[in-house]
């Protein structure tokens, strides 16, 4: 999706950045959807709903379609200022916001394990299921970085330095996400 990200950056880069706090690149959902629309139009035409990975697993367990705001922030289809799906960004991808999941908090109990899921997995029917969130924010949280000024260093396939703040720092060179803790953020490299 490099060509699609490059085109987005050239034509809509500033507008996308103002809403998503990220520059168009191959890691975001928006250019990936455009790639799918251009390269696999039949498959794209069959899309009814768009799930993020963890949300699909949770849907299998609960029959509830939703995602958390941190996951949404990583899609480049979400207005981080208004904390909602952005119709114009969705239109760039060739979709509408109603194809995307309702937004909830990562800690919200969104449903319970259904009978069908219990039978398929061995999990106890009726077990409460929370929304959950992205891997990196949970790594930041689990490392103990839960106060302004704390820093985490992630050494993995994709290493990151994350500084905990009480506001976003929109910068073309940073990746900005909300923290798991209300009112905090973790912009980083």
Predicted regions and their residues:
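Glycine-rich phosphate-binding/catalytic subdomain of phosphoryl-transfer
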Residues: 1-189
